[in-house]
Each structure stands twice: as structure tokens, then as C-alpha cells.
Amino acid sequence: MNSSTFEVLWGVNNIYSVVEVNTNTVYEGVIKGKFLNTREKEYSPLVPGDFVCGDIYDEHKVYIKERMERRNVFWRYNKKVALRQVIVSNIDNILIVSSATLPEFKNSFIDRTLIVAEEQGITPIILVNKVDEGINLRVDSFIKIYEYLGYRVIKTSVVTLQGIDEVKKIIKNSRTSFIGQSGVGKSSLINVIDLNASQAINEISYKYARGRHTTVYAVAFHSDNKILIDTPGIKEFGIEGLGYLELKYYFKEFKYFNDLCRFNSCLHINEPNCFVISQIGFKIAEARYNSYLKIFSELKRYKSYAREIFGKN
């Protein structure tokens, strides 16, 4: 058997589509044995973007022996199994797609995805899609907030093609994943950005989604010196796997103020002489601070729950 390095494109029911790095030949891969050489229990042992070592044992089949170290992972917390669920790995950019109209623009979803991107060193870009249908004052105010923080925000439309060329420039020669809630138009965007990628992703989704043209599995596609990864629409984006004491480091607007509080251990909740709190409504948007409080409460509550139920520290 010949050993080689492969990249995972997608996987369904423990069968993976992998592409050999040196030849770009696609194989069907299965994990040899029960588990990979991972250090801890994982919900997603292999995801699109992973690199693996394996043995070719048939013309089109591979035994996957080892997962190589991940440069980064984009994850969310899976409440059903009480574990981090890795969605994609080894990416440069995460395109966070939201809608200017319907479904409703949810800043709470965006804030959580930004936190994971900050934690993992992934460049986040916010796409406000369907702008041809109009942008209300609430959405416009959040666009200004995120731009003020230094995040790149692109207004897009598959109808007028606004912002599409800008997105194409970003993803050129890079590894990029799309993420967003159901109905925000991720698949439609990919369709106008790269038709070949869209068709390939749709074929896989249609085959394994019982005839529905909707993304049900994360799927990677190589095209013109870039890698695009589409992901299923997400209803909830929990980040309970993150420690609540760390949260303040992933809110960009706190970065220059964390050391100006009276106490080094200040969590910016109700401590005296908290400089962060003094900046609410000035350098810090009230909506973002309220988001911080909500997420902080969720993480702290989960910490107590995990300690009681699972004995986790």
C-alpha cells in the first residue's frame, strides 16, 4: 500500500471524500480502526480542511491512519453531546453571512462567531446579504459598529451583484469558509462567486439530503487556487466550550481598556472603577456590551453546570 497526504473535502456516515495533495486525485477514505490518534474525545474527528495521512489500498480507496495537526478550527458547542463540534479546519477566512432583511439580522450570532474567529486567529469578514431589499436603521447601526471595531463589512446582493467582486478578491489564493443561519443566502452567494463550486456542492448535498437542494454537510471545493467551504445553516451558535474568564480578551473594543481598570482581574461586570464600563456609549457600543454580558452569563452558568454534572473544571 502507498502512503500519502490527503485533504478532507467532506464526510457522510464515516465515509470521507479526500483529495491527494500531490496529485489532486480524489479518493474515498475510511478511518482505519475505531479512532484516530486524537488526544481527547471529539464530536468531529474529521472535517473539511483537515489534512490526513493514509494508505491507498484500492484504485479509488484510502485507509485514513492519522490526522495531522490543525492550524486552527472553527467550532461551536454541541449541547446534545456536551462537546465542541469542529465545523471546518485550517482556514484563512471565515465569511459570516447575515441578511439585511429576512431572516432577521442577529448581532448575537455575529458576535459569537467573531469570538471564535478571534480565539482561533481566523480572519472574519461580515457579509450583509440581500441589500437590494433595503437596509433598515438597526442593521445600518450594527454595520457602523463592526466597521468602527475594524472588522471588514461587505454589503452583498446576488440580484445586483453588489459586493461580489470584492468578495472574489478576498477569497483568491486563500482557504475560505462560509457560515450563517438558514436562509441568509450562503449557497446563492457561492453560486455567483464560483459556479463550479456551487454545482459540485449542490450535487453532494442533493445526494445525501434526500433530494433537497440544501447544504446539510460541510463541503470543501478546490477551484482556481482557492478553497471554498460551504456549511449547513446554523440555528444556534453556542460557545459554551470557552472559559468565561477568557471572554473579555475576544471583544476587540476591550483590548485597550482591560489594563486601565482598577483591578487586573476585572471582568467588566460590576467591579468598582471599571474603565470598560465607563466607556459604554462612548468608545464601546451599548449593544456590544449587552452582548458581552449575555454571553458571559451563559459561559459562567455552563461552567457551574459542567462542574456539577461532568466534574469538569
From Swiss-Prot:
Main location: cytoplasm
SUBUNIT field: Monomer. Associates with 30S ribosomal subunit, binds 16S rRNA.
Keywords: Cytoplasm, GTP-binding, Hydrolase, Metal-binding, Nucleotide-binding, Ribosome biogenesis, RNA-binding, rRNA-binding, Zinc
Cofactor info, note text: Binds 1 zinc ion per subunit.
One Gene Ontology term of the molecular function aspect: metal ion binding
EC numbers: 3.6.1.-
Binding positions for GTP per the UniProt entry: 129-132, 180-188
Cofactor needs: Zn(2+)
Alphabetical list of HAMAP family matching this protein: GTPase_RsgA
Taxonomic placement: Bacteria, Pseudomonadati, Spirochaetota, Spirochaetia, Spirochaetales
Pfam families recorded: RsgA_GTPase (PF03193)
Coiled coil: none
Residue positions binding Zn(2+): 261, 266, 268, 274
Record's protein name: Small ribosomal subunit biogenesis GTPase RsgA
Sequence similarity: Belongs to the TRAFAC class YlqF/YawG GTPase family. RsgA subfamily.
A GO cellular component entry from the record: cytoplasm
InterPro entries: G_CP_dom, P-loop_NTPase, Ribosome_biogen_GTPase_RsgA, RsgA_GTPase_dom
Compartments, record wording: Cytoplasm
CP-type G domain segment(s): 80-237
Task of the protein: One of several proteins that assist in the late maturation steps of the functional core of the 30S ribosomal subunit. Helps release RbfA from mature subunits. May play a role in the assembly of ribosomal proteins into the subunit. Circularly permuted GTPase that catalyzes slow GTP hydrolysis, GTPase activity is stimulated by the 30S ribosomal subunit.
A GO biological process held by the record: ribosomal small subunit biogenesis
Organism: Borrelia duttonii (strain Ly)
